Amino acid sequence: MLEGFDPTTIQDVESARQCVVRLLNLIEALQADNQALRETNQRLQDEINRLKGTPPRPAVKANAPSPDPATRNDYSSEKERQKPKAWNKSSKLDQIRIDREETLRVDPAGLPGDVQFKGYEEVVVQDIILRTDNVRFRKEKYYSASEQKTYLASLPRGYEGEFGPGLKALVIAWHFGANMTEPKILDQLRDVGIRISDGQLSRWLIRDQERFHGEKSARYEAGLRSSPWQQIDDTATWEKGQNRRCHAVCHPLYTAYFTTATKERLAVLDVLQDFRARRYRLNAEAFGFLEMFGVSWRVVNALKQLPPETGLSEGEFLRLLNEHLPQLGPQQKSRVLESAAVAAYHAQREWPVVRLLVGDDAPQWKCLTAELALCWIHEGRHYKKLMPYVAHHVQLLESFLDRYWAYYDQLLSYRERPTPEEKARLEKAFDTLFATVTSYEALDERIAKTRAKKESLLMVLEHPEIPLHNNRSELDARRIVRQRDVSFGTRSAEGTRARDTFLTLVATAKKLGVSFYQYVYDRISGAHQMPSLADLIREKANELNLGASWQPP
């Protein structure tokens, strides 16, 4: 192929330069294919070893990150984004509650005769007491011969079942707040003298939690009503060994967890409505979705014969579809259901409608709200996943990422002091940055994809109160991952619901600065001296004004 080729005869330098660029990109493509084939080969080898019964390849983690980009799997951008912060150590004495005071005296036998008393020097020492508080209640008992009835004094609230509210609240706090497993909790309780069965402990964590389920719904509704925007993310979990998706919906004052069988758009819609019964409506918005989804005109014309602008239950809508569109395929049927359900969600007034979601670019978030804001950090991970092999391409990628995060910093500054002039400048700067063309084809393709997301990435220019990233909900989703690692999933739908409810309480209490243990104890004991978290969300939301940009001028 190269017989007779003499590089010294090259006259057209520009064409030669273009040829070199193409060859370098070909090297990148071949390197990527080679790495993919290596990974596939290793997976197949591992499967062969498993079938043969031989030990699998040990998963040995390196002590230091690999310098080879092809084997790197850390896509974090924290180093690029991190800014040094001034560290000031503050006193914590004013935050410590003093439970008792003890005066320590000097042994007079060791003092000289000329000493003078100069007062006291105070030292605060924190400690904890972990011991039993077993009580023998002597309940008064009366008998009425005339009524043939016995009158017996009642146990205090929270002491039902021969265990007190302090113990019940501590078990819930250990399991859901500290991620302790049930066997470890049993070991700890038995070590301090509590006699309790495995089944009793499990029932405390799962059964008869209706009061907490009700409070969760109230907190969620308060969170949705307190802000027109919400953040969302999901993660994998298990129930009875079956795959499930757990969704985390949040903003700065609360977090709510919901588990569904799938992560499709209708499942997310159920989450946004707190699993209220689905309704369906065929209106202009629904037909707009159908057109966007590319549903055939024959299906659309048939749907236009159904009752318009009418809220239908799921049973009613499915019956109409079966009557008028019996041959409707599964994919088009799914699009029809999604379009009508989302339109009904937007049209109803009984439940708060989310106007903007902050999330990643997963397809299930789209069309659920009027606006969608994308996470800049998630978008940046796409660039971190590029694995250039050629040194020049590495330099091009690093140079572009420096500009990317510099622009991100400018957006952060805009959030603090938004002005129309800065908004216009940042819009132009976005166009300039993402019009960049390099000689690295994979990078150019990635830049073009980011440019296509301009509206969602620059949503912060319209609504400066929303975050530029989705880290808050991603961290909330990790709480489920940590719980999953401890318990390996739940074993019943009741257990899943209890986990979602109490993790909602854990995360929300932390955001509001409320003690999770004290709150659970307050509710179990029946004291109800602490305000509901829903009330706190409403109160603090008024102070933060989370929807300022949606309010009329």
Residues of each region from the PLM?
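Short, flexible loop/hinge motifs at secondary-structure junctions
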Residues: 1-161, 202, 232, 277-339, ...
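Short helix/loop capping segments that flank catalytic or ligand/cofactor-binding pockets
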Residues: 119, 152-154, 239-241, 248, ...
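RNase H-like nuclease fold core
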Residues: 191-194, 198, 203-359, 363, ...
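Acidic/histidine-rich catalytic cores and adjacent linkers
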Residues: 305-333, 349-367, 398-553
